[in-house]
Design a protein with these regions (language model features):
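Alpha-helical transmembrane segments
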Residues: 60-80, 147
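Membrane-water interface of transmembrane alpha-helices
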Residues: 77-98, 162
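Alpha-helical transmembrane segments and their membrane-interface junctions
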Residues: 50-54, 116-151
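Alpha-helical transmembrane segments and their immediate juxtamembrane interface regions
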Residues: 139-179
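Short membrane-interface loop/juxtamembrane segments of multi-pass integral membrane proteins
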Residues: 94-116
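The transition from N-terminal targeting/processing segments to the mature protein
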Residues: 45-49, 91-97, 128-132, 207
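Select subsegments of transmembrane alpha-helices in polytopic membrane proteins
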Residues: 34-45, 109-123
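N-terminal, intrinsically disordered, low-complexity segments
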Residues: 1-31, 185-212
Length: 212
């Protein structure tokens, strides 16, 4: 879907996905950040479960040291994420404007992108944990991933609520831009785009969530 900005609003033009391949896309801010928070939290909980299983099986783990690593990683990720989230949200709200000419990601493309992103993250962490089990007898990597993932995930889910609240206050829909071939939204500051809420009857049925 192509969104053409016209002043404070926008015109939605449906085009073939092949014609839009390789172009930047815009995605709903609250939905995208919430999904990222869910993936990071799930990744952290999966790593924590992996460590607990190793501990129950009397594998190569050090509960005391791993607990310290987990707590430090959780605290660091939470504090750093809170500062980054605050700056990211503030910057986006200051730069909020209607989109000029951008691709609105379709539901099918969004589903495919998110599946690939989650698969790559879980596969990468899984390989890292297996290697850590072979070369280490502490289990610190699993604790580190668990703490960082849970902390960052909580921050993202809290930020998603702020995006939803901002949409309600402004009676609009707020979007973030995904670069070509990007699997997740940028963690740093980026511009945001705004479209007014339209009537539900005007929403294209194949693209739910664009105008509600």
């Amino acid at each position: 879907m192509l969104v053409l900005g016209t002043g404070s609003g926008g015109i939605v033009v449906t085009m073939a996905d092949a014609a839009l391949a390789g172009l930047p896309r815009i995605v709903r801010a609250d939905d995208e950040i919430r999904w990222r928070g869910q993936v990071l939290t799930s990744l952290g909980l999966a790593s924590l479960s992996y460590w607990i299983i190793l501990w129950l099986l009397e594998g190569p783990v050090d509960p005391v040291f791993a607990g310290i690593v987990f707590g430090a990683a959780l605290l660091f990720a939470f504090v750093l994420g809170a500062v980054t989230s605050r700056r990211r949200f503030a910057h986006a709200m200051l730069t909020l404007r209607p989109p000029r000419s951008m691709v609105h990601e379709t539901v099918a493309n969004s589903r495919d992108r998110r599946v690939r992103a989650a698969a790559m993250m879980f596969l990468g962490v899984g390989i890292l944990l297996l290697l850590d089990t072979v070369v280490s007898d502490v289990g610190a990597t699993a604790a580190l991933v668990a703490g960082a993932g849970i902390g960052a995930g909580i921050i993202d889910r809290l930020e998603a609520r702020r995006w939803a609240q901002a949409e309600d206050e402004r009676e609009s829909r707020i979007f973030l831009m995904l670069r070509p071939n990007a699997l997740i939204a940028r963690m740093g500051a980026q511009d945001a785009y705004e479209l007014p809420r339209g009537r539900r009857d005007d929403e294209p049925p194949e693209f739910p969530g664009t105008y509600l």
